[in-house]
Amino acid sequence: MKLAYFSVTGQTRRFVSKTDLPNVEITPDDDLEMDEPFLLITPSYAEESPTVSKSIDVMDSVFDFMAYNDNYKHCRGIIGTGNRNFAGIYIFTAKEVSAKYQIPLLYDFEFNGTPADVAAVEKLAAQLDQGAKVTFKNPL
């Protein structure tokens, strides 16, 4: 299973480089079309007010990628990464993408992940490759 990922500070890129999975980086500069199943790994950059939480503009590349030529139709699941110190907006972008496209949020980890996180994502990818089914539950 291929990983499609977005990285702002390099944390997500470092995590992906620790896996043995094929991958492609989402960048703001190109239109990337996916024609095979993939897992999306996205960091979260969000803002929160008393009435609303939303991803900030730096995350537009993730939403643009998912919409481009209906890439979201090939996405088998979403993995969020972030910092738990941000409490209510921890992995918010992953939750927002999951809710928008009704794609399961399958896993989350902090920063650039631990060896256990790498093993868990590789196992999850292998299970999906072997036909495992997952169910969408709205994370918001």
Curated annotation (Swiss-Prot):
TM segment ranges: none
InterPro entries recorded: Flavoprotein-like_sf (IPR029039), RNR_Ib_NrdI_bac (IPR020852), RNR_NrdI (IPR004465)
Any single biological process term in GO: protein modification process
MF terms (GO), sorted A to Z: FMN binding
PANTHER family listed in its UniProt record: PROTEIN NRDI (PTHR37297:SF1)
Record function comment: Probably involved in ribonucleotide reductase function.
Family classification: Belongs to the NrdI family.
Name this protein carries in UniProt: Protein NrdI
Gene: nrdI
